[in-house]
Amino acid sequence: MSHTVKIYDTCIGCTQCVRACPTDVLEMAPWDGCKAGQVASAPRTEDCVGCKRCESACPTDFLSVRVYLGSETTRSMGLGY
């Protein structure tokens, strides 16, 4: 099953999602757009098991990292008809 991992610009660079991921899908990448100077990225989405632990670990009010599971991806992004 294919999962989509999306990182939003509300990321504060706290690394909570990276530490929560059991399959090391996420990593931190340099980014000047936040105070921490880094942002989460998802270079290995093919390893995502869809557990959504990254979402649970995110401390921001609007989750900075979201995992969309299979058909959820098109529905959540407004692509389903």
Curated annotation (Swiss-Prot):
InterPro entries: 4Fe4S_Fe-S-bd, 4Fe4S_Fe_S_CS, PSI_iron-sulfur_center, PSI_PsaC. [4Fe-4S] cluster 2 binds at C21, C48, C51, C54. GO terms for cellular component: chloroplast thylakoid membrane; photosystem I. Its cofactor is [4Fe-4S] cluster. GO terms for biological process: photosynthetic electron transport in photosystem I. It is an enzyme of class 1 (oxidoreductase). Its EC number is 1.97.1.12. It catalyses: reduced [plastocyanin] + hnu + oxidized [2Fe-2S]-[ferredoxin] = oxidized [plastocyanin] + reduced [2Fe-2S]-[ferredoxin]. Residues 2-31, 39-68 form the 4Fe-4S ferredoxin-type domain. It is found in: Plastid, Chloroplast thylakoid membrane. It is a peripheral membrane protein. GO terms for molecular function: 4 iron, 4 sulfur cluster binding; electron transfer activity; metal ion binding; oxidoreductase activity. Pfam families: Fer4_7. The eukaryotic PSI reaction center is composed of at least 11 subunits. Apoprotein for the two 4Fe-4S centers FA and FB of photosystem I (PSI); essential for photochemical activity. FB is the terminal electron acceptor of PSI, donating electrons to ferredoxin. The C-terminus interacts with PsaA/B/D and helps assemble the protein into the PSI complex. Required for binding of PsaD and PsaE to PSI. PSI is a plastocyanin/cytochrome c6-ferredoxin oxidoreductase, converting photonic excitation into a charge separation, which transfers an electron from the donor P700 chlorophyll pair to the spectroscopically characterized acceptors A0, A1, FX, FA and FB in turn. This is Photosystem I iron-sulfur center. It comes from Tupiella akineta (Green alga).
